[in-house]
Amino acid sequence: MKKIIVTGGSGFIGSNLVKYLLKKKYIVINIDKLSYSANPYNLKGISKNKNYHFIKSDINNRKKNIQIFTKYKPYGIINLAAETHVDRSIDNPNNFVQSNILGVYNLLESLRSFIKKNKKKIKLVHVSTDEVFGDVTKGRSDEKFVYNPSSPYSATKASADHLIKAYVRTYKIPAVISNCCNNYGPNQFPEKLIPKLIFNIINNKPLPLYGKGKNSREWIHVKDHCSALLQILLRGKLGESYNVGS
């Protein structure tokens, strides 16, 4: 059975991905520092699954990363460890720089050290966002779309994408990038738009309006995203980016 590390596996997308991979008969190692948006309850009921392992750790901790790689020798890593809320990034961009840029840098350096010492490849799927493309006024963005981030959040994710590509080219790190649209589904943190709208409607509260109310957004169910991430891990070409949408 192949072993897959999921970083940020106790969050919204991460917890759904962990469950999806377990159903597909993979051994899953969940690395999560359990920040405010992570919730161990998301994975209630699978802690006794012999194919599931949880490690509380921060991907900025290189020593711990290498210890985990050495112990489990995974086939791949799907990196979901990130700060993701746009409004929070405007209020406090520092946390986003620490997690989304430095976290990816330290994860890459950990991988580079492990691969150099052990001569064993571990494929990395870095989960990014379509927010890196900024406002798309016509049609759809594709993988060759020019980056134009418009918030501290999207700027940090764009920076991480460029780091990934540079490490693939410079150090031959086996990595790919996915850029996905907005997700919805079970276990989503209530600050996100769809659960927030539902909560406000139920409680007769006003609905948030962004811009003039004429903007359009694309959503994908989180389980479809999980399916795409596994296919990118198994079939994605190293150094490439893959847009994921509905």
Region locations from a protein language model:
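A short, basic/aromatic alpha-helical/loop segment that forms part
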Residues: T170, S216-W219
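N-terminal Rossmann-like NAD(P)+-binding domain of SDR-like oxidoreductases, especially those catalyzing
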Residues: M1-N183, K223, L233
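Hydrophobic residues at beta-strand termini and immediately following loops
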Residues: I55, S178, L209-Y210, V244
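Short, conserved catalytic or interaction motifs in soluble domains
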Residues: Y36, P186, S246
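Short alpha-helical segment that forms part of, or immediately flanks, the ligand-binding pocket
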Residues: N94, I198-I202, R217
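Glycine/proline-rich active-site loop of Rossmann-fold NAD(P)-dependent oxidoreductases
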Residues: A158, N183-K196, N203-K205, L209-Y210, ...
